[in-house]
């Protein structure tokens, strides 16, 4: 019926959203819990004053350090995707046993990829990572 489209269209046996992983992206944007590849997860809670992100080991067999670095990447990704701005506090796991300086340096490196140029002052006295990101 449309010879100009012959060879340019193909039949997909599955729903296009499943093939292109749109459902998983949509779920990760709308849900408060985001699962990481390691089996760990992060929980994002927005309030009027600030956003709090909690890192949980979940079913991960990885070390605290590995989970925290994986979570750092996903946190910075979620901040961009959800356009979260303002004050953000991240509660990483086992910070008394993890190198907070290395994690802070890594977060600052990841922040360089963000067009809103978030500030990463570092860790609070209670071991929470502070992030200040411009609101969109």
Where are the regions a protein language model picked out?
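Extended, charged alpha/beta regions that create polyanion-binding interfaces
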Residues: 1-49
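Conserved glycine-centered short motifs in functionally critical loops
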Residues: 38-136
């Amino acid at each position: 019926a449309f010879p100009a489209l012959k060879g340019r269209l193909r039949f997909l046996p599955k729903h296009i959203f499943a093939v292109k992983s749109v459902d998983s992206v949509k779920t990760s944007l709308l849900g408060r819990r985001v699962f990481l590849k390691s089996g760990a997860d992060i929980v994002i809670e927005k309030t009027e004053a600030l956003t709090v992100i909690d890192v949980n080991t979940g079913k991960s067999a990885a070390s605290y350090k590995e989970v925290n670095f994986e979570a750092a990447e996903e946190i910075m990704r979620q901040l961009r995707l959800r356009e979260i701005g303002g004050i953000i506090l991240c509660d990483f796991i086992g910070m008394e046993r993890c190198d907070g300086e290395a994690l802070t340096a890594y977060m600052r490196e990841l922040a360089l990829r963000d067009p809103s140029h978030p500030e990463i002052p570092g860790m609070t006295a209670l071991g929470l990572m502070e992030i200040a990101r411009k609101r969109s």
